[in-house]
């Protein structure tokens, strides 16, 4: 079943088994399993869009870039964003740092936060029974972390 509910703030996105820019893209089994879990447990919708990001517990949305392969880097990116969902206030310490006053400290703890989200995402995958090719996982993780390490 395909749901085509329009998001007013995001006119290019439709919900669930996803109509995106006129193209229907059904979620693969493992991606859907994670998406369904997030909806049931946290009320979080997983949507395809122009970015990959967890929009926060208030907005209850995770966007995965529409060009991602939802069986590989898209799934791993989703699991990483689940890692952010599972983070505690302590894990998000960098958000308490004034980036203008202490930019190096902010960027360092932001980098640590990203590593933590990857770790939590992998543990979550294991708990939910999601199959992960560890070599592919590490490749996607390292590509992502590299973008943060350049800021250090």
Regions of interest found by a model, annotated:
Residues 18-32, 36-72, 85-89:
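Active-site scaffold of zinc-dependent metalloenzymes
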Residues 73-81:
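Short alpha-helical catalytic segment bearing the HExxH-like zincin motif
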Residues 85, 116-119, 123, 127:
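Charged/polar positions on well-ordered alpha helices
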Residues 88-119:
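Post-HEXXH active-site segment of zinc metalloproteases
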Residues 55-57, 95, 143:
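Short secondary-structure boundary/hinge segments and terminal tails
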Residues 7-20:
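Short, positively charged and aromatic/hydrophobic N-terminal segments
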Residues 25, 29, 69-74, 122-152:
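Long, well-structured alpha-helical subdomains associated
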Residues 1-3:
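Non-Sec secretion/translocation targeting segments of pathogen effectors
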């Amino acid at each position: 079943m395909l749901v085509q509910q329009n998001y007013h703030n995001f006119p290019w996105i439709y919900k669930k088994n996803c109509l995106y820019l006129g193209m229907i893209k059904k979620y693969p089994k493992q991606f859907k399993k994670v998406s369904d879990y997030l909806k049931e447990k946290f009320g979080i919708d997983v949507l395809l869009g122009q970015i990959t990001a967890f929009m926060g517990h208030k907005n209850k949305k995770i966007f995965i870039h529409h060009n991602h392969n939802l069986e590989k880097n898209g799934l791993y990116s989703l699991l990483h964003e689940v890692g952010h969902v599972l983070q505690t206030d302590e894990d998000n310490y960098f958000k308490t740092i004034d980036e203008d006053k202490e930019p190096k400290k902010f960027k360092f703890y932001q980098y640590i936060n990203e590593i933590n989200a990857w770790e939590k995402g992998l543990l979550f995958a294991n708990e939910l029974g999601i199959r992960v090719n560890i070599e592919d996982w590490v490749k996607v993780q390292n590509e992502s972390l590299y973008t943060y390490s350049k800021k250090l």
